[in-house]
Amino acid sequence: MTNNAAAPLYSLRGLPLIGWRDMSHALNYLFADGQLKQGTLVAINAEKLLTAEDNPEVRALIAAAEFKYADGISVVRSIRKKFPQAQVSRVAGADLWEALMARAGKEGTPVFLVGGKPEVLAQTEAKLRTQWNVNIVGSQDGYFTPEQRQALFARIHASGAKIVTVAMGSPKQELLMRDCREVHPHALYMGVGGTYDVFTGHVKRAPKIWQNLGLEWLYRLLSQPKRITRQVRLLRYLRWHYTGDL
């Protein structure tokens, strides 16, 4: 019998990644025995592995996160190459966030949202309440000063949130989650980048057929040509992959 409450770990470039078989496995793992896990979720793709390689502070942030999972198809392929028996699939961060919100709405789990433009955040809250009856106990847009951080952490703690999602981009969101956990440790934190923009329709995500083919990165590149310099960096990751330097 398959144990959905457990998941193997696979190491890439010295970072242990959770090997989820699919979205159902991910949710059952995070809500094992009816208890939501506590810690930090970090989506790992090739670009994030490259950044971790070059930036010791980012690497330390990622290494400290309890739940690092394969968000990028290239990372999934590298795991399968290094560990041929691995039963691991891509769990896209945007999809995991939506599934987590749907589950939270079903179970009444208190949620605090951080990040995004004020209007996008307001639309995200409204849609979450309408679509899944999510119990949103507080929110804060991404426009706050460093001096306001401690007040934000105090608000999150006072809210009793069990899920805190932060849309500020990497590594800002990882830094904020790390610091907030010192004040409010008993929650599941998730960095979600631009997910609120996608969820509310302000940014168009790749069609499902592109996602299923593992070409979401190419769709984003064609839609946003300025990303080309970021994609060129990935040649280094391809060298790691094809030379087995994983």
Curated annotation (Swiss-Prot):
The lineage of its organism: Bacteria, Pseudomonadati, Pseudomonadota, Gammaproteobacteria, Enterobacterales. NCBIfam families: PRK03692.1 (NF002980), wecG_tagA_cpsF (TIGR00696). It holds the Pfam family Glyco_tran_WecG. The keyword Hydrolase does not apply. Disulfide bonds: none annotated. It comes from Salmonella agona (strain SL483). It catalyses: UDP-N-acetyl-alpha-D-mannosaminouronate + N-acetyl-alpha-D-glucosaminyl-di-trans,octa-cis-undecaprenyl diphosphate = beta-D-ManNAcA-(1->4)-alpha-D-GlcNAc-di-trans,octa-cis-undecaprenyl diphosphate + UDP + H(+). Its EC number is 2.4.1.180. GO terms for molecular function: lipopolysaccharide N-acetylmannosaminouronosyltransferase activity. One of its GO terms (biological process) is enterobacterial common antigen biosynthetic process. Catalyzes the synthesis of Und-PP-GlcNAc-ManNAcA (Lipid II), the second lipid-linked intermediate involved in enterobacterial common antigen (ECA) synthesis. The gene is wecG. Pathway: Bacterial outer membrane biogenesis; enterobacterial common antigen biosynthesis. This is UDP-N-acetyl-D-mannosaminuronic acid transferase. Keywords: Glycosyltransferase, Transferase. Belongs to the glycosyltransferase 26 family.
